[in-house]
């Protein structure tokens, strides 16, 4: 066993002595050592209940004849961090999480790992670590929260609360109505109830094969979560015995299938960023062109909030992720069904008995929302390395208008609230990319303000930053190269005409190459916003969004 490095041989007597101080007995040194990578943190509702989850996981691991050791990672709540400097720490926290898991697991030579993530950057951070460490691993997420209901009976979620702020600001609702939405938008523990980033990544974890069937949709408060925990321990023991590791599971074909599910569900645009980062950790050459190819062959089968009033509990009731995959499998060339997963079985075997139980929630292949996926990759002179739009969250397929330019999210939000943006405008928020932000903050506050003011179909928003999974409307993010790297977005001037064509996958500014070249010569890179601490180091090492915004190790040659 891998853990023999710290527990076998006369020279490991000091190691065993220390381990006995934790409560181990001599017989435990013949069992696999299992890392329980938890992410319990009280300020995040999606993680507040994970302390109890950790106890259940440890019980299940012991029952399976293995020895559990629990530790916790950090976490950032994107909703609470939204709209202020805290959001700059969100994406960088993914790297800290990956590094901390790598540190604990490799320093102590664990034989296997069970990861308990849930929210936005915690799930991909742990997934990156699992691929980097490459020991048998199973994921059991904390599960989504239920949707809420106002006193009037309206179904609401966190997106409703953010949009309520814009609606109140523009006089569309009263302060009492906003308070009602606030009080009921997040009714329980769990990841926010729509197809936002957390749930998108937990669903993708399931189809990638790192998590068990049901992981993406079973609610946090559902007793079936406890059954998943028991299964996870049993399956991990099988993976250890068969030496099946994350890199055996997360192949190029598995990533194809993850994006296929993403397209079928219209997941968060952040999934592109995180899954490209996973590919980097797995040593795979996977780029945005391949994502676009997946998008072209996968129909959009279900719309979940913010694209509709359906939530993860509805997906679960309608058959869950397995039912969506089973329906997708009817179309030739969409899924790779014979690859191995964390169950020890193939994807085909995992979904064999699944079925759609409500075709209003999960559409059939014969009745898709659209013939192509709910995410699109756009390219053009404004995004030579690509940009992403959640096409399933807007009915507008082509938009052309003049730029209204802001050099930060704070500046943009203030301008929107002061009425500086009008119908037909293209709002540009730049210098908010991985390096420029730094940290590529999410733009949920500006998009929610636009939607709440009733301009969601009449104003477009472009950024080199990110969008929350709760964002909707004509929102194009991840523009690469970013402004801080001298991308075309940095060269835009007030009033330039921008064209967004979702069907043709184009993002263009109506300015000649000659004029853009002239502007590039005159452009000067702004001083970094942060030069010290973690964010200062992050800004120096982070790569572009089109490669997952991972950290690049300096070349010391």
Swiss-Prot record:
GO molecular function: 2 iron, 2 sulfur cluster binding; dihydroxy-acid dehydratase activity; magnesium ion binding
SUPFAM superfamilies for this protein: IlvD/EDD N-terminal domain-like, LeuD/IlvD-like
Residues that bind [2Fe-2S] cluster: 119, 192
PROSITE patterns linked to this entry: ILVD_EDD_1, ILVD_EDD_2
Domain of life: Bacteria
Family assignment from sequence similarity: Belongs to the IlvD/Edd family.
Subunit structure: Homodimer.
Gene name of the record: ilvD
Pathway: Amino-acid biosynthesis; L-isoleucine biosynthesis; L-isoleucine from 2-oxobutanoate: step 3/4; Amino-acid biosynthesis; L-valine biosynthesis; L-valine from pyruvate: step 3/4
Cofactor or coenzyme needed: [2Fe-2S] cluster; Mg(2+)
Positions of post-translational N6-carboxylysine modification: 121
Name under which the protein is recorded: Dihydroxy-acid dehydratase
First and last residue of the signal peptide: none
Keywords: 2Fe-2S, Amino-acid biosynthesis, Branched-chain amino acid biosynthesis, Iron, Iron-sulfur, Lyase, Magnesium, Metal-binding
Active site: 468 (proton acceptor)
Native organism: Bacillus anthracis
Function: Functions in the biosynthesis of branched-chain amino acids. Catalyzes the dehydration of (2R,3R)-2,3-dihydroxy-3-methylpentanoate (2,3-dihydroxy-3-methylvalerate) into 2-oxo-3-methylpentanoate (2-oxo-3-methylvalerate) and of (2R)-2,3-dihydroxy-3-methylbutanoate (2,3-dihydroxyisovalerate) into 2-oxo-3-methylbutanoate (2-oxoisovalerate), the penultimate precursor to L-isoleucine and L-valine, respectively.
Intrachain disulfide bonds: none
